[in-house]
Amino acid sequence: MMVNRKILTLDEFTIQQMRAFPHATGELSNLLRDLGLAAKRINVEVNKAGLVDILGDAGEINVQGEDVKKLDVYANNQVMGVLKHGISCAGIGSEELDDFIAFDDPVSNNSKYVCMFDPLDGSGNIDVNVSIGTIFSVYRRVTPKGQPVSREDFLQAGINQVAAGYIVYGSSTMLVYATRRGVNGFTLDPSIGEFSLSHPNIQCPEFGKIYSVNHGNFFQYEKPVQDYIQVCQQKTKETGGPYTQRYIGSMVSDLHRNLIKGGIFMYPATKDKPKGKLRLLYECNPFAFIVEVAGGKATNGKVRILDIVPTELHQRSTLFIGSKGMMEELESFLQRENA
């Protein structure tokens, strides 16, 4: 079979990007390739999850107070394993772990990056065949090289991210990552076992016709959010609509669709969860970085997500994220509450 050499693989693309910086060490390229390897391994297990004993609970509760799925454990071990045995990551923080882990060895202590990740977002949906995903975020350490990383290396504002991305395991497996140079998407080609560049220079449309929110919690939301949702429902062709509501319950899938097609995703505070439910470091920051690089916006309803300085590893947040024009329309409603 002839391979189309006009399509770059993930490895080739990251090397090409590195060559634009004469003094680059290649550590970030290596780290991204390591994450690509973990994604391939997780993809294999996701695709056969219904055939082997990997569905269901692992009999554990994670730091979030949630039942840990067997596939969560597998995915967490795969991401942690490739980063630990690579040469570019000094330590990791995972949604599934109580605390960060410093890879305290001579090579890792001299690495300049730390990685935060949600190993398997939406795993509660896998037994009904809904797309799920992995989310990751890369920061440059702030402590001196040559020693183990510490908590301050992880408690950084999202604006300090060097790269962020996600993998969606669906009808095809796709890896999307952003640096300050742009957002690019790679689809796993099963014929060669490589992620190949399929969506170069992704731009989030300024407007879309999709809004994503859990309508089941409508009466728990603050009034400005309720008002905006009702406006979305009432949009007509004359007012830029009609809008359609799409909410899968798998954050990676919802945000991937809205990034490509244009739209807005909302996870507001509720009476039960006044601080929000999503994890700032593992979910909000990575997607805020990706969407902003692509031309969109992300806030917690009051301030820009990327400006929030975290005080704990598992800090929660509300999230409003998506197309710039739709976000600005939403903000006009939220500002009434904050005025």
At which residue positions do the language-model features occur?
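IMPase-like, lithium-sensitive Mg2+-dependent phosphomonoesterase catalytic core
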Residues: 2-53, 60-62, 73-339
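Alpha-helical scaffold segments that form or flank carboxylate-/histidine-based iron centers
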Residues: 66-69
